[in-house]
Design a protein with these regions (language model features):
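Substrate-binding pocket helix/loop in short-chain dehydrogenase/reductase
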Residues: 31, 79-80, 87-89
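A glycine-rich helix->loop->beta "capping" turn
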Residues: 34-37, 57-70, 76, 115, ...
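The beta1-alpha1 cofactor-binding region of Rossmann-like NAD(H)/NADP(H)-dependent oxidoreductases
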Residues: 42-53, 85
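Active-site helix of classical SDR
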Residues: 103, 139
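Active-site-adjacent segment of SDR/Rossmann-fold oxidoreductases
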Residues: 108-112, 128, 144, 149-159, ...
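Residue(s) in the substrate-gating loop at a strand-loop-helix junction
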Residues: 123
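Conserved small/polar residues in nucleotide/adenosyl-binding loops
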Residues: 229-236
């Protein structure tokens, strides 16, 4: 049946500068071409006011809110002994505070209407660890914990909250230098070829499924939608197999 969507992208360059509506608007146009309805937003989730602005826009444009998905992110990779407070804080503000700034105002609506779906974005970097990403890993593991708590708080109101740990090429991940990729290469072993997962299109169905009635029993979980690689570290981690995906029981 489709959905009415607020597409939010602050439109910044990788260095954090700029506020271009182009990235959000291009997605809006793609949705419109497929017969859907969408509007663009360039609010910054790094501020509580920006997060509320996104939620308010959904209510103003479409009259209700049923789902929030919070994939906003930036990278400021640096070894801990070289990392500045600004590099630390920028990543925490966008990822962790950014998740809170959207979920908090949405939760009030969901609690009142006794329904809603929340899908946040964690990462292997937080759950397992990548060198050079103490800021990113802390934020992403924080999102996993945040999501589990929100799930407990809102579950009794008919609301589910789950986190995805994805693996996909985006504007952000394309900025990772080859030297860094090589340094991390030993952390993973290749998955079976038929399980390769590389593009956002491969992750999107997991997000969509979590927002359906058939996933109403899934709450407070962290789901690995990251099948380009499987992690050695997961071998001893209790988890539930879900059609090739893994729900981490942490």
């Amino acid at each position: 049946m489709g959905a009415n969507i607020v597409v939010n992208d602050v439109g910044a360059k990788l260095d954090g500068t700029g506020n271009d509506v182009g990235p959000a608007q291009s997605v809006v146009e793609e949705i419109s071409e497929l017969g859907g309805k969408a509007v663009a937003s360039t609010a910054s989730v790094a501020s509580v006011a920006g997060g509320k602005q996104i939620i308010d826009k959904a209510i103003e444009e479409f009259g209700r809110l049923d789902i929030v998905v919070t994939p906003a992110g930036i990278l400021r990779d640096r070894m801990i002994f070289n990392m500045t407070k600004e590099e630390w804080q920028d990543v925490i503000d966008v990822h962790l505070t950014g998740t809170f700034s959207v979920v908090a105002p949405a939760s009030k609506i969901f609690r009142e209407q006794k329904s809603g779906r929340i899908v946040t974005f964690s990462s292997v970097s937080g759950l397992i660890g990548y060198s050079g990403q103490s800021n990113y890993g802390a934020a992403k593991d924080g999102i996993a914990g945040f999501t589990r708590v929100v799930a407990k708080e809102l579950g009794k109101y008919g609301v589910t909250a789950n986190a995805i740990s994805p693996g996909a090429n985006t504007r952000m991940t394309q900025s990772v230098p080859d030297s860094t990729r090589a340094m991390r290469a030993g952390v993973f072993k290749p998955a079976e070829e038929e399980h390769f997962l590389y593009d956002p299109d491969d992750v999107a169905p997991v997000v969509g499924w979590l927002c359906t009635d058939s996933a109403s029993h899934i709450n407070g979980e962290v789901i690995h939608a990251c099948l380009l690689y499987t992690s050695d570290a997961d071998d001893d981690t209790p988890c539930v197999d879900l059609g090739g995906l893994r729900i981490i029981k942490k």
